[in-house]
Amino acid sequence: MSVQTYLVAYNVLQILGWSAILVKTVLGLANGLTWPQLYESVEFELKIFQTAAILEVIHAIVGLVRSPVGTTAMQVTSRVVLVWPILHLCSTARFSIGVPLLLVAWSVTEVIRYSFYALSVLKQPIPYFLLYLRYTLFYVLYPMGVSGELLTLFASLNEVDEKKILTLEMPNRLNMGISFWWVLIIAALSYIPGFPQLYFYMIGQRKKILGGGSKKKQ
């Protein structure tokens, strides 16, 4: 299998997976599911396709794609932590309004992003509407996603603290302690410099790519 075939297959599978999550999320919201019920309706697909994104870090490391390793690793790690240590282990997190916010933001973003990547790998022209969506919807989707992630994270803190989830207390053979509660607090604080930097970067990219929008459409 060629690298191109592999990358196309990966991106197409991600498009299908996140499309399924998006459809289930919209239907769940339309049918008035509670936030825990909404999460349960997409839990299987969410765990599979978000965990599969770890491959993107490997793609960047071995040079299959030109994505920066550090940025890719941080973005993937933050989501994987939300899916597994937080939403999987902390039932209270599923009651947060952050759940529908992050599900909508993630799924719409990923369907657009992977469609963009698939066409890029195939060296096909990117339709203007796809460029427009990719470099416009982030104005709403990024704040929505970050809000959803933080609200879900905050909703898990009490349970993490009470149950000592993923926490290593002293004394122990390693003679060291690790508090997952503090790990989450530090992760939340990292959004303060991280979000504005990424947000304004995307604004710059939008001006660069869509600045001559009328010419591109022609």
Swiss-Prot record:
Cellular compartments annotated: Membrane
Domain of life: Eukaryota
Gene source species: Caenorhabditis elegans
GO terms under cellular component: endoplasmic reticulum membrane
Stored InterPro entries: Tyr_Pase-like_PTPLA
EC number: 4.2.1.134
Name listed for the protein in its UniProt record: Very-long-chain (3R)-3-hydroxyacyl-CoA dehydratase hpo-8
Entries under PANTHER family matching the protein: VERY-LONG-CHAIN (3R)-3-HYDROXYACYL-COA DEHYDRATASE
Residue stretches spanning the membrane: 15-35, 44-64, 86-106, 137-157, 176-196
UniProt keyword Repressor, yes or no: no
Pathway listed: Lipid metabolism; fatty acid biosynthesis
